[in-house]
């Protein structure tokens, strides 16, 4: 949820029926309000943050994530993650934007060194706060090098199009929320079920071994060779590499 329509009734329903919720907040007030404004241009931060804090506390700081998207406009995204922690959140995620290269906020290849340094900066502060008793969980640092998911999960990755679907407010079914609006990936509707089974079958075969450039990648069983949406946007087929 983006939090705009979140109220006590919705919180109560989610706490009763949903084991995990994702609360969309892009970080600091200026960052969030630039990317998540209302139609009149005003920002959403002041409205949604108190609701998210109440929601997280109602779950005893478990079974939720505050999740943001960083863009070229905030390559200092570690400050946004730490802002979550300063607001009292303990479960958080921050992911790079998926955008057409023509967009001014799209991440470019020359940004990668700065992004890698920022993850290092975040990791150092993450460890520091953990030692100080102010720790938090950052989803993308939760990587178990000795155990982790089963081999089938490592091969298949996120499971989009087969293990889960995105449902729009109009009931349309897509392999994942990032595909919503792309008609070539419309799988059906909640009333009709999955009608376009060819899409499901394509995603069913989308795994590490189906990706031609991924079979020699040393970390392929940790990233499952990347995101199908990114592959479709930038490399062609959903089983391409990105």
Regions found by a protein language model. Give the residues of each.
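Radical SAM/AdoMet-radical enzyme domain recognition
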Residues: 1-97
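Short, solvent-exposed loop/turn segments at secondary-structure junctions
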Residues: 4-6, 28, 71-73, 99, ...
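Generic recognition of stable, solvent-exposed alpha-helical segments in well-folded globular domains
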Residues: 9, 47-50, 79, 114-117, ...
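Beta-sheet entry/capping signal
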Residues: 20-21, 62-65, 91-93, 136-137, ...
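Short, charged, surface-exposed secondary-structure boundary motifs
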Residues: 31-35, 102-103, 186
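Short helix/loop capping segments that flank catalytic or ligand/cofactor-binding pockets
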Residues: 32, 175-176, 226
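A C-terminal junction/extension of Radical SAM enzymes
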Residues: 103-182
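Flexible mid-to-C-terminal extensions adjoining Fe-S/redox cofactors in radical SAM and related proteins
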Residues: 181-242
């Amino acid at each position: 949820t983006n939090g705009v329509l979140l109220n006590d009734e919705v919180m109560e329903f989610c706490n009763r029926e949903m084991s995990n919720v994702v609360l969309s907040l892009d970080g600091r007030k200026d960052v969030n309000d630039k990317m998540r404004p209302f139609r009149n241009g005003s920002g959403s931060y002041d409205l949604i943050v108190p609701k998210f804090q109440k929601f997280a506390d109602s779950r005893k700081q478990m079974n939720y994530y505050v999740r943001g998207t960083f863009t070229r406009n905030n390559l200092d995204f570690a400050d946004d993650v730490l802002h979550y922690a300063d607001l009292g959140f303990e479960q958080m995620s921050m992911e790079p934007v998926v955008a057409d290269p023509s967009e001014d906020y799209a991440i470019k290849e020359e940004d990668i060194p700065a992004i890698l340094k920022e993850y290092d900066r975040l990791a150092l502060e993450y460890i520091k706060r953990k030692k100080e008793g102010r720790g938090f969980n950052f989803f993308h640092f939760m990587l178990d090098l000795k155990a982790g998911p089963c081999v089938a999960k490592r091969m298949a990755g996120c499971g989009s199009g087969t293990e889960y679907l995105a449902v729009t407010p109009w009931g349309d079914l897509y392999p994942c929320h990032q595909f919503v609006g792309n008609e070539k990936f419309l799988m059906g509707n909640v009333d009709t079920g999955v009608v376009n089974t060819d899409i499901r079958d394509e995603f069913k075969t989308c795994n590490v071994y189906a990706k031609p450039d991924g079979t020699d990648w040393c970390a392929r069983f940790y990233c499952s060779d990347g995101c199908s949406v990114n592959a479709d946007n930038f490399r062609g087929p959903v089983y391409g590499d990105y």
